[in-house]
Amino acid sequence: MQGYDEKLIAHSKKPLNHGRLRKYDILYNLDNETCGDGIRVYMRMKGDRLDEIRFDGKGCVVSVAAASMVSRYVKGKTVKEIMGMDDESLKRIIGVKIVRSRLRCANLFLRAVKKGLSS
C-alpha cells in the first residue's frame, strides 16, 4: 500500500458501512471492467431519503476507501441530493488527491448508488 495517503489506507483497512443489510429496498451490483473491482450496494429508504446503506465486494485501496467515505456522506441524503453528486463532490468528500487513472475506482461506489437509486 506504499504510495497511498494514510486516510485512504485507514478507510480501506476498516471501511465504514461494510457488510450486508438484512432488510433492504435496493440491491445493486456494479463492476469496474478496467481493473476487476466489484461492489454490491444495499440501500434502505425512508421516503425519498437514504436511511441505511452498506456495501461489500472486492476492490483496491481507492475503491474501498472511497466507498467507506461516501457511504457515510450519503446516509440521510435525499435521492435528489445524491443524484446531483459528481466527480467534484466525490473529490471533496474523499479529501485527498486521486490521480486521474484511479478516478474510475474512486467513483465506483457512487456510480453503483446512483444506478441503484435510478433503477
Model features per residue range: what roles?
Residues 1-119:
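Domain-level signature for proteins that mediate thiol-based redox and metal-cofactor handling
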